[in-house]
Swiss-Prot record:
PROSITE patterns: HISOL_DEHYDROGENASE. The active site is at E322 (proton acceptor), H323 (proton acceptor). Binds 1 zinc ion per subunit. It comes from the Bacteria. Catalyzes the sequential NAD-dependent oxidations of L-histidinol to L-histidinaldehyde and then to L-histidine. This is Histidinol dehydrogenase. Zn(2+) binds at Q254, H257, D356, H415. Its EC number is 1.1.1.23. It comes from Listeria monocytogenes serotype 4b (strain F2365). Belongs to the histidinol dehydrogenase family.
Amino acid sequence: MKILTGTVNELLNELKIETDTNTSIQVETEVKTIIEKVKTAGDQALFDFTSKFDGVGLTELRVPAADIQAASAKIEPAFLDALQQAKVNIESFHSKQKQHAFLDSEKDGVIRGQLIRPLETVGVYVPGGTAAYPSSVLMNVLPAKIAGVKRIVMITPPGENGINPYVLASAQLAGVDEIYQVGGAHGIAALAHGTESIPKVDKIVGPGNIYVATAKREVFGLVDIDMIAGPSEIVVLADENANPAFIAADLLSQAEHDILARAILITTSKKIAEETQNEIDKQLENLPRKAIAQKSIETRGKIIIAATTQEMFDIMNEIAPEHLEVQLENPMNYLYQIKNAGSIFLGSYASEPLGDYFAGPNHVLPTSGTAKFFSPLGVEDFTKRSAFISYTKEALAKEKDAIVLLAKKEGLDAHAKAIQIRFEEEN
């Protein structure tokens, strides 16, 4: 890892904060073609693309309930118990996020209020590839269930032996209503437009590769999406009292995701910087995903030595990381200095994987600096708000002149007339 020193501005310039757009012109062109084919050919396009991209010849898209039950029966009880414990924690945290309707009748003859309604149908994308992510199923599905979404449709690409049984078991535990064995940009297109087998949804959530991310960007507006996620990120803030072995392990926990993952340590201690570097080298040797983690650390990893604790927070807030660990003495004292971070881990024993799997807060987080204006996935992402008003004639009479004046100043005479006509019989 490269060690950086200097002023805040020099460090930020050296860091050259990358905003990963997770797309390219070539990919965008390919994705548009895929979406159009799914839009016109429906299920047949999904069969063709699954054969082409996944090397799997399908005869049906929906995973039968019997297959889901059989997959769950194969899973070791200890894993199912761990999954159940995680589910309880995720549900207990997200249940506190529920928004509430309100009714305001403070003014005579006036009723105003807000309704909160769940989305009808949500599509959840679960990646395939070299790793299975049952935790991603829980994190995307459970907030939707708590919000009251009636129909949750999951898609995931099949492998040679079908869908990973741990993913299926997680989907059953979370309460997914339908599962389809299709992935990629063609799967996103199916959720956005609907096919003979797959329903059109109101919103698509879940992570994926560059094709999935680009497809989500393309269909946004036809349906809602959660966010466009880039490679995983972690920033660790550490003082001289931090444990270098803990820091190194947490940095590597993100580096093993992807060669484009970003792992950054910001510290006021040169000793901690050097010892963490040594720990990373040592721990890398025993990692099964060493090649990925090492490439990430070498090309995207950074150690920044700041002059003061305040500088540490200034740099971190500009980075706006997906994951932030505060390994400082009395970490709670610094909570309100954090302006921009997706998920925050306070203290040496609040390790980032605790949030990935178990503690309860969501692990679907803004990346690439977007924590400056985006939030983690939550219950509110699966609801919508509607306002309502009711006025008596007497209440409207008190306010009609002001309304007419505003409408006429905007040149919208029909708006003004709509108010005036209700009182014309009195003149």
